[in-house]
């Protein structure tokens, strides 16, 4: 795309688009994670085991979220991404509100599946739009800002879910967080503009050219060794993160006799503020050090994960609630370093017409490893530990969890080693 023919996108439009997408992603995580603060009252009301609650909070959502993300990303590489995001937002918000009507495990599972189907259309489209708005040197920072929707959404979900459930019951919590997303979808449709594809890189996708299939994109990515290690490391990091986020509220309720309001407030702060700082710091440090040595785009994550391991172990061994929260803030912060740079490097590894599908392939790996298996595995381990540790079964289940980050750190180290060569092979396809 020549400078003369390329339309000018103002900084105001870039910032507005990024800002709206952050708000959308915030609602994405409010609705995704609201169940984690409601596990205990739903378990008692509907008579569901820890393993069953793990399936509801993770697997029921994540299987459909992960698998449908790729075909919907294929749509995003062909269709208006703004419209797909707005429609997806309306679907998942409506299904969140309907979760409040569930009377048994299966009805709640259907509602969670609906949330997963709706949310599958969000991030691949958003990543593709932001990659078209921001050049490579700013992309990790932009995607880190977008990823702030994760800790902000979790924080507000914890705050609102705990307080509303204590005051009005768990069903009302679903209604209150679901309905505003329907209104936000109208804002997306009416005010967000679709950017030209390849704009930030001075490229123009050939719209007459046949789009690559999901299989072709996946085959392209797996020939890049940096992607294989990056996706594996990201999946393992997500495995730790989703298991922790899902079960930490229940741990503090059971181990420290906190109310839902108290657990929601304190964990909202810990998951929100250190988590947000970790996302921003990870993106900024990756851009800063990666500009000097490409390997450090991902080696920054390696260092962060190694430091997180002892902090996580200590957090679940202490007997004082405030010290546990303080120690937990460090692995929460460091465990979020991967967010911006992981997705930014995948956007850099993918040609223009593959970007939305490439993001979806990565999301599939992250969510299949992390969200499909993470929450139910913690619950299953907790159920298995009951005979040995009784009331501390969940404590020791979560204690073991953090050590998986050692495995994740190895893959980020290897990914950084291969990254420069793989980026150099990317053509303007």
Locate the predicted segments by residue.
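Conserved MFS/SLC helix-loop-helix module at the cytosolic interface between two early adjacent transmembrane helices
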Residues: 67-103
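Juxtamembrane intracellular "pre-TM" segments in multi-pass secondary transporters
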Residues: 3-10, 198-231, 255
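Helix-loop-helix hairpin linking two adjacent transmembrane segments in secondary transporters
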Residues: 146-194
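Extracellular/periplasmic helix-loop-helix junction of adjacent transmembrane segments
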Residues: 38-67
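Multi-pass alpha-helical transporter architecture, strongest
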Residues: 187-191, 311, 315-316, 399-429
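Extracytoplasmic gate region of multi-pass secondary transporters
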Residues: 35-36, 224-279, 335-339, 343, ...
């Amino acid at each position: 795309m020549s400078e003369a023919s390329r339309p000018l996108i103002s900084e105001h439009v870039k910032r507005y688009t990024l800002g709206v997408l952050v708000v959308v992603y915030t609602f994405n995580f409010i609705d995704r994670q609201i169940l984690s603060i409601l596990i205990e009252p739903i378990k008692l009301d509907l008579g569901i085991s820890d393993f069953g609650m793990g399936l509801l909070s993770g697997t029921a959502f994540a299987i459909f979220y992960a698998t449908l993300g790729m075909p919907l990303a294929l749509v995003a590489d062909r269709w208006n991404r703004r419209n797909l995001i707005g429609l997806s937002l309306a679907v998942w918000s409506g299904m969140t509100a309907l979760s409040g009507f569930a009377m048994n495990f299966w009805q709640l599972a259907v509602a969670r599946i609906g949330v997963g189907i709706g949310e599958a259309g969000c991030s691949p489209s958003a990543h593709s739009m932001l990659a078209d708005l921001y050049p490579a040197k700013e992309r990790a920072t932009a995607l880190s800002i977008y990823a702030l929707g994760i800790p902000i959404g979790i924080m507000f979900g914890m705050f609102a879910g705990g307080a509303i459930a204590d005051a009005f019951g768990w069903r009302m919590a679903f209604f209150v967080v679901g309905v505003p997303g329907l209104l936000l979808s109208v804002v997306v449709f009416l005010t967000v503009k679709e950017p030209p594809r390849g704009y930030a890189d001075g490229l123009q996708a050939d719209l007459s050219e046949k789009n690559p299939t999901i299989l072709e994109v996946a085959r392209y990515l797996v020939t890049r060794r940096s992607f294989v290690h990056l996706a594996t490391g990201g999946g393992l990091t997500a495995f730790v993160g989703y298991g922790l986020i899902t079960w930490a509220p229940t741990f503090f309720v059971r181990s420290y006799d906190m109310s839902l309001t108290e657990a929601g407030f304190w964990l909202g702060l810990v998951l929100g503020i250190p988590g947000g700082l970790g996302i921003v710091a990870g993106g900024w440090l990756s851009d800063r050090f990666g500009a000097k040595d490409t390997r450090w785009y991902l080696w920054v994550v390696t260092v962060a994960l190694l430091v997180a391991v002892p902090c996580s172990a200590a957090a679940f061994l202490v007997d004082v609630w405030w010290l546990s929260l303080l120690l937990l803030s460090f692995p929460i912060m460091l465990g979020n370093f991967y967010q911006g740079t992981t997705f930014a490097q995948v956007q850099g590894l993918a040609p223009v017409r593959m970007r939305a599908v490439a993001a979806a392939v990565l999301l599939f790996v992250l969510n299949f490893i992390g969200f499909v298996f993470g929450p139910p595995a913690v619950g299953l381990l907790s159920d298995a530990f009951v005979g040995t540790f009784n009331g501390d079964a969940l404590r020791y289940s979560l204690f073991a969890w953090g050590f998986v980050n050692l495995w994740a750190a190895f893959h980020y180290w290897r990914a950084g080693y291969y990254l420069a060569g793989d980026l150099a092979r990317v053509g303007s396809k």
